[in-house]
Amino acid sequence: MPRTQRNDNFIDKTFTVMADIILKILPANQKAKEAFVYYRDGMSAQAEGEYAEALDNYEEALNLEEDPYDRSFILYNMGLIYASNGNHERALELYHQAIELNARMPQALNNIAVIFHYLGDQAAASEDGEKAEQLYDKAADYWKQAIRLAPNNYIEAQNWLKTTGRSTMDVYF
């Protein structure tokens, strides 16, 4: 049964109805509309913690979607799932693919930085200071890129960059 027929959440149901109306009036081809349905169902499943179902829907959407910008968001959402499940390597691959298609995606840059920072913490905990510093430097590079794109966001990252001496910039815009 399609997710749209079993959605009991009022907000999700409202979103689904609105999305269906928009799909009917938008001048998009059938393939693009079908891709959006899979993407929408993927987002709904992801919100409910049904990650395997979400990934299946995102894969279908990715197979159908031709627009690079839209594909970037599908890849980004897939990266979120892999990151939340601890598969950082796959998440990094997907975030990088998303950025290749959409260079103005600060949230993907931020998430890459978060992963490198986490891995840096892991290296520090295992007393590999050199590796930790390398990973923290990578995190800093990605946070700087994200902050340049969205200077009012990522305040904690900006503070971390300043307190660790990894940034001499006071303002990113």
Curated annotation (Swiss-Prot):
TPR repeat placement: 35-68, 72-105, 120-153
GO biological process: photosynthesis
Bilayer topology: Peripheral membrane protein
Disulfide linkage: none
GO (cellular component) term, any one: plasma membrane-derived thylakoid membrane
Compartments (UniProt record): Cellular thylakoid membrane
Keywords: Membrane, Photosynthesis, Repeat, Thylakoid, TPR repeat
InterPro entries: PSI_Ycf3_assembly, TPR-like_helical_dom_sf, TPR_rpt, Ycf3/AcsC/BcsC/TPR_MFPF
UniProt-listed PANTHER family: CELLULOSE SYNTHASE OPERON PROTEIN C, TPR REPEAT-CONTAINING PROTEIN MJ0263
Biological function: Essential for the assembly of the photosystem I (PSI) complex. May act as a chaperone-like factor to guide the assembly of the PSI subunits.
Family designation: Belongs to the Ycf3 family.
Protein's name in the database: Photosystem I assembly protein Ycf3
Protein source organism: Cyanothece sp. (strain PCC 7425 / ATCC 29141)
Record gene name: ycf3
